[in-house]
UniProtKB/Swiss-Prot annotation:
InterPro entries: Calcineurin-like_PHP_ApaH, LpxH-like, Metallo-depent_PP-like, UDP-diacylglucosamine_Hdrlase
Cofactor note: Binds 2 Mn(2+) ions per subunit in a binuclear metal center.
Subcellular location: Cell inner membrane
Pathway: Glycolipid biosynthesis; lipid IV(A) biosynthesis; lipid IV(A) from (3R)-3-hydroxytetradecanoyl-[acyl-carrier-protein] and UDP-N-acetyl-alpha-D-glucosamine: step 4/6
Protein name: UDP-2,3-diacylglucosamine hydrolase
Family of the protein in this entry: Belongs to the LpxH family.
GO BP: any one term: lipid A biosynthetic process
Signal peptide: none
GO cellular component: cytoplasm; extrinsic component of plasma membrane
HAMAP family: LpxH (MF_00575)
Function description: Hydrolyzes the pyrophosphate bond of UDP-2,3-diacylglucosamine to yield 2,3-diacylglucosamine 1-phosphate (lipid X) and UMP by catalyzing the attack of water at the alpha-P atom. Involved in the biosynthesis of lipid A, a phosphorylated glycolipid that anchors the lipopolysaccharide to the outer membrane of the cell.
């Protein structure tokens, strides 16, 4: 058996091929797993569990079917869907996890996260992240009418796109010191995350031992998952 990890699908109505590919994944590979972990940015945007978006209901039902089949499903928030709440989690049968979680998998201690907190060189983003994760600000935003939330979210996405266009690729990648610090804090030799859209398996030293950082790819033109078994940790790409 295997435990599966995915991230950065950025589901939206404008990308039906990705949605169709994810539905096939849920109906196939996911049903064979010991567990499924979604490490953030499942959706391109999330302005509240109360948004009457048919895509959200469709995805909730599909994930719930996996959960009901006996495969536990877990979710860590990303930078796009950090407002996804308990209502959607309940509807989809997912368990919400903290932003950093250590798993014991087949004899390995594995740290999982979305990955945006590792990009500490991007001071502008980290300041923005700290602001929008304030509970009182989230409560205020979610209390606004839906049409107002949609306008604010659209403006924020436009501002983010403009800001990122002038940033170097290095700044938007993880900081190696932040990676080592996180792994040593949790005493792990394995880290799995998404966010950067730069799929790879990196070797490093943490806790004075060889360690590995596995980065999930985004679901742009193909699917991406990490498959952890008793024998191996594989980064796998597959067609929709």
């Amino acid at each position: 058996m295997a435990t599966l990890f995915i991230a950065d699908l950025h589901l939206c109505v404008e990308e039906p091929a990705i949605t169709a590919g994810f539905l096939r994944f849920l109906a196939g590979e996911a049903r064979k797993a010991d567990a499924l972990y979604i490490l953030g940015d499942l959706f391109e945007a999330w302005i509240g569990d109360d948004e009457p978006n048919p895509l959200h209901r469709q995805m909730a039902a599909a994930i719930k079917a996996v959960s009901d089949s006996g495969v536990p499903c877990y979710f860590i928030h990303g930078n796009r869907d950090f407002l996804l709440g308990k209502r959607f989690a309940r509807e989809s049968g997912m368990t919400l996890l903290p932003e950093e979680k250590v798993l014991e998998l087949y004899g390995r201690r594995v740290l999982i996260m979305h990955g945006d907190t590792l990009c500490t060189d991007d001071a502008g983003y980290q300041a923005f992240r700290a602001k929008v994760h304030k509970p009182w600000l989230q409560m205020l935003f979610l209390a606004l009418p839906l049409f107002v939330r949609k306008r604010i979210a659209a403006r924020m996405r436009a501002n983010s796109k403009e800001a990122n266009s002038s940033k170097s690729l290095a700044i938007m990648d993880v900081n190696q010191n932040a990676v080592v610090s996180a792994m040593e804090k949790h005493q792990v030799q394995w880290l799995i995350h998404g966010h950067t859209h730069r799929p790879a398996v990196h070797e490093l030293i943490a806790n004075q031992q060889p360690a590995f950082r596995v980065v999930l790819g985004a679901w742009h033109t193909e699917g991406s998952m990490v498959k952890v078994t008793a024998d191996d940790v594989e980064l796998i790409h597959f067609p929709f």
